Amino acid sequence: MTNATNYIETISKELNLTVAQVSATTKLISEGATVPFIARYRKEATGMLDEVAVTNIRDRMQQLVELDQRRDAILKSLDERNLLTDELRSSILKAETLSKLEDLYLPYRPKRRTRATIAREAGLEPLATKLFDQGSFDVFEAAKEFINPEKEITDTDKALAGARDIIAEWVSEDATAREQTRQLYRSKALVRCRVLSGKEEEGQKYRDYFDWTEPLSKVPSHRLLAMRRGETEGILILRIHPEEEEATQRLERDFVQNNSPAGEQVRTAVNDAYKRLLGPSIETEMRLESKKLADEQAITVFAENLRELLLASPLGERAVLAIDPGYRTGCKTVALSAQGKLLHHDVIYLTASERERMDAVRKVMVLIKEFKLQAIAIGNGTASRETEQFFKQLQLPKTIPIVMVNESGASVYSASAAAREEFADYDLTVRGAVSIGRRLMDPLAELVKIDPKSIGVGQYQHDVDQNALRHSLDDVVLSCVNKVGVEVNTASRQLLSYVSGLGPQLAENIVKHRDENGPFKSRAELKKVARLGPKAFEQSAGFLRIRDAKNPLDASSVHPERYDVVKAMAGDLKCTVNDLMKDPMLRQQIRLEQYQTEDVGMPTLTDIMQELAKPGRDPRSQFEAVEFQDGIEKPEDLKPGMKLPGIVTNVTAFGAFVDVGVHQDGLVHISHLSDQFVKDPADVVKVAQKVNVTVLEVDLARKRIALSMKSNPELGSTSRSSRPSDRKPQGRETAPPRPKQNQAIGNDWFSQALSKAEKHQKR
């Protein structure tokens, strides 16, 4: 059985899919198909798998390949050193996880010189073996035979100590012992966090974790990442371990056979193995494992927030006046055409003298009239509410909405290579205002130009695995761009680069071809683009739109490979494809089963019919502006009990942040998202969603605003429900175990580590 077959069967079982589904999907991926293409245009082959399922297959396949690569490297290393027995080879080939594989390899891994190594060099391994067998003999008499002053083994105590070091290493490297200890950590380890002495004032933002204990199995991802950040900043010290007594008792049951003198030597070695070797090793693993899990959860939150933001409702092709507000430096103002082209830029001053305000009124009214502007976009940063009030006082027609736009990342874009390339002759402030206006017109087209991490919808995004984050966010952007589709004759290079099958180089070639030869008149013309071969065309064509093309299907998501099916439908009804798209009565006469083939099944035919009814339909919802409450412009204006409109700016594992128009987002804790119990905030709210909230509490000193979405919330109730310090686990787990009378405080790992860290701080 080949590795590929093994992979397919493993994935099939893990994801509860048929072997045929997994096999077809992996084959398509290996042939260069993208996730959006497979999910959209190969439904018959995959059995209607969606993007999530296809992505899971792809990622799991990669993990299994990497596992086998590591397995092969280990087998090669052992074979080259003549250490590979048939039994060991069999165990390695059966290992299903990386941790199991590494456990098996650990005793044979080239290692630095250890206490056990030194003991072996002193000839103490036979003594260790004899002790480990735990027979009935005088251990001190046996140890006398191994006294060797030349090797610094000057008495029986040193001989026995060296033998115990060897036994301790055997125990710590035993694959079964490691796995059992690993499972103990996963089920019963406590996360213990304390503040370093003298760091209390500096670390006030971490004060909830100054003396914090919680089961590892229950700690939320955001809390673990917060504690780790505090540790990185030198404020906190974090440890993860179960009660030492339980861990050592389990090991003793496995390794100590009796209470003989030899058995007592083994018991001592086992305890040393756990404290000095196995415990710290598994703790390191658990830190990495829990961090990876927390990263995955944080990345999932970020990815879902990004998806909602990218798929936010577009204003559409309407000429816009965009403003990047400011006080001293004024408001950077730009007029944009319906296609987002910069028509004019200026600076207006709204918070200065009356003369300057009147000059601003004149400028704005001239711009609106001259360029027939149809909407006002205001960045939601500094001076945004004052700017909004200024425009409301102009009493513009109701057909011209005044919209607050989230400007997170606009400054990043304005300094980017893409912005410099497009607006080389304009400064950063003009570029930023343009980005704000375009973000209102089409959030997706504009946000793809910005590093997703700069958009401000993540949770500890700078603390998580950056490669995993980039991989996940790229998947989300790719998914969103292809879900909406791209107008090939107006799209930016950045937007085109996310189209299935293209990438940066082909996107650049398309723009270059468009600039040199004019707009594309058909999808078929894409084949003339340099280096855009048959595979790239297959993967991309269905997601690229050409408005007003001679063939109306070029403006739809019907793939060119299925044009003949639509032509056959039209031919059978003796009409044109255009007639078929315009006349629902004609479409009702189509009998889909007549057009089924081996490659074209009902899923594809159903998609085609939907496209004929609404060609190139935009899946994004209708645009609807949000107006903040007048007179509420800064945190000081907020009072408990106020009911306000707002917009969700970020969703996290512990709640949602909401902009109510005071330049500082408020938090709706998970316990206040609904009158019913909420397990996952993402089930209740989405980024860019419009909500109504009640102000619960305003802490100006800590810059915290507590909000509620409950119908009748208790004011001030968040002070106890939203802080982790008030949710410590009850019972024995609320604090580290007290040391026994014969157990010195210094023997506790945590106390030792804390003391060591504090000494390091003082140096």
Model-predicted regions and their roles:
Residues Q183-L190, I323-Y327, G381-E386, V405-V412, ...:
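A glycine-rich phosphate-binding loop feature that marks nucleotide/adenosyl-phosphate handling sites
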Residues K100, L104, V403, G409, ...:
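Long, charge-rich intrinsically disordered scaffolds of nucleic-acid metabolism proteins
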Residues N16-L17, S313-L315, L478-K512, D630-V668, ...:
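C-terminal accessory/binding modules appended to enzymatic or scaffolding proteins
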Residues V320-A322, K332, E388-F391, S522-E525, ...:
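Short beta-alpha junctions and helix-cap segments that line functional grooves
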Residues A53-N56, Q63, L67-S77, R81-A322, ...:
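Duplex nucleic acid-engaging cores and interfaces of nucleic-acid transaction enzymes
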Residues E145-T156, T213, R229, T248-Y274, ...:
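Low-complexity, acidic/Ser/Thr- and charged residue-rich accessory regions of DNA metabolism proteins
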Residues T34-V35, T46, D50-E150, K483-Q622, ...:
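Accessory alpha-helical DNA-binding modules that contact the DNA backbone or grooves
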